[in-house]
Amino acid sequence: RNNPGGLLSQAVKISDFFLNDGEIVSTKGRKISETRRFFARKGDAINGKPIIVITNSGSASASEIFAGALKDHKRAIILGENTYGKGSVQSIIPLKNGGGMRLTISKYYLPSGKSISEVGVTPDILVEEKVDGFKINSETDNQLNYAINLLKS
């Protein structure tokens, strides 16, 4: 949660760490030739141990790829709130004046084929945040406490 994203390549790598096989994500550009599919190859490094991914509206882009891939493969329980719903791959084009222009170059799709653009990844278990700010290991972190109790049960 509260992860605004990052590189597509890193989302694929971290997802691959927890999946035995199958598609992680696909990207589709304007032309059919711009379609790319990314698959898990390494195998589940933690051998099927339970995973809970906590999400909220601050979870976007690469973190949505990770949460969505693990959810679609039934490899993790997604707990918390709906994610942001970015759903696009962007590139920075350098400008002569030293600035840059961010350009959407493709949309990404979860293994189910679903686009999360503007809708996000829906949690399996809805637990709304009740704290102001983000404090890991806080006694008032109801989402974290819910996840810990779920893992203990």
Regions found by a protein language model. Name each.
Residues 2-4, 153:
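Flexible, low-complexity junctional segments that flank or bridge functional domains
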Residues 90-94, 101-131:
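Conserved P-loop NTPase
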Residues 115-153:
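Conserved functional hotspot residues or short segments at active or partner-binding sites
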Residues 18, 51, 70, 113, ...:
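Terminal peptide-recognition signature
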Residues 4-61, 88-94, 109:
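Gly/Ser/Thr-rich loop/hinge elements
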Residues 7-14, 62-66, 75, 140-151:
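Stable alpha-helical elements in mature extracytoplasmic
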Residues 58-60, 73-86:
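Short, well-structured beta-strand/strand-turn elements
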Residues 47-50, 74-75, 88, 99, ...:
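Envelope-exposed proteins and targeting segments
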